[in-house]
UniProtKB/Swiss-Prot annotation:
Similarity comment text for this entry: Belongs to the phospholipase A2 family.
Residues annotated as signal peptide: 1-20
GO cellular component: extracellular region
Record flagged with keyword Hydrolase: yes
Biological process terms in GO annotation: arachidonate secretion; lipid catabolic process; phosphatidylcholine metabolic process; phosphatidylglycerol metabolic process
Protein name per its UniProtKB record: Group IIC secretory phospholipase A2
């Protein structure tokens, strides 16, 4: 019974950190662009969402490619940007990144900076967002197999 309790606490903590990072990015996208990250950007083009590859289809997709590259660089430094939680504030449309207490603080702050650049890029390219590039279940056959290097 004690083993199950320890396991459940571990799963809760891992899930909370994963979801918190996920939700932080979602909230940032919503505040800055006015759009839902999931319904507007997940599955957009060749790089928005999981498993990016090919040539970005437009400026919005290039935002996602740059975000992937930013996260990739953090991983090279030993960070886990999807898991490293962070704090942010938005005042007059300006995002300010901070970090939560505990391990991964610097990595969390750097992940926030990646997310911040991405949402500003999304906002800058709202006028050229093309709904036909958004797929609910992205298979991305038009993207090819090769991944664009950072």
């Amino acid at each position: 019974m004690k083993g199950i309790a320890v396991f459940l606490v571990f799963i809760f903590c891992w899930t909370t950190s994963t979801l918190s990072s996920f939700w932080q990015f979602q909230r940032m996208v919503k505040h800055i662009t006015g759009r839902s990250a999931f319904f507007s950007y997940y599955g957009y083009g060749c790089y928005c969402g999981l498993g990016g590859r090919g040539i970005p289809v437009d400026a919005t997709d290039r935002c996602c490619w740059a975000h992937d590259c930013c996260y990739h660089k953090l991983k090279e430094y030993g960070c886990q940007p999807i898991l490293n939680a962070y704090q942010f504030a938005i005042v007059n449309g300006t995002v300010t990144c901070g970090c939560t207490m505990g391990g991964g603080c610097l990595c969390g702050q750097k992940a926030c900076e990646c997310d911040k650049l991405s949402v500003y890029c999304f906002k800058e390219n709202l006028a050229t967002y093309e709904k036909t590039f958004k797929q609910l279940f992205p298979t991305r056959p038009q993207c090819g197999r090769d991944k664009l290097h950072c």
